[in-house]
Amino acid sequence: FLTTMIYQVMKDYDFPYKVYIDTPLGIDIFNEYRKILSGDELKLFDEVLNWDNLIFVRDAESSKALVHSNEPCVILSTSGMCNNGRIRHHLKKAVPNPNATVLFVGFSTPGSLAALLKDKNVKSISIDNKQYTCRCASFSLKSLSGHAPFCQLLDYYSSINTNRIVLHHGSEKAKLTLKEKLTSELEKKCKSTRVIIANSSLKISL
């Protein structure tokens, strides 16, 4: 989706920079995504795939070469928390560079590398046991998250029939808020479903 947005914005402006998709899983998803599209959506997707500026980085050696390149470009790489994957190598170069911008899409777990980069009060970060001074710009596009919004979670989980719902993903504060609101919605629908917040000692019998 982000790739399509970049294409739609830049295609008519003689955009001079390459857009690299540096994620093996992401490339596989591109291929699968094309199988489910049809009509105008498929036509637009094919336009994006055939865009001269778009380059897929499939192997590790090509990714390493991109890291060491000084070419101005856009790099799309997965790992929302930045804790694993190729993105870490790109960050080692981008973070101390005042001319670089790191753009996040969606939620990042508190304490993760991504969350630290989003925090304007953090002056340096550690990647693979080496400190990097934060000189790059960083922004977050919360509107592009692939996660369901709070209201949709309430609607869905309060509509299903089950004995219990276990909340696992997310920060403790967010899970506590969801538990309280969801319990209230379930009670309004005369349901006795238990809402449980998972922790490391919780054991569930299936």
Please describe what each predicted stretch is.
Residues 1-206:
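Acidic/His-rich, metal-assisted hydrolase cores and their charged scaffolds
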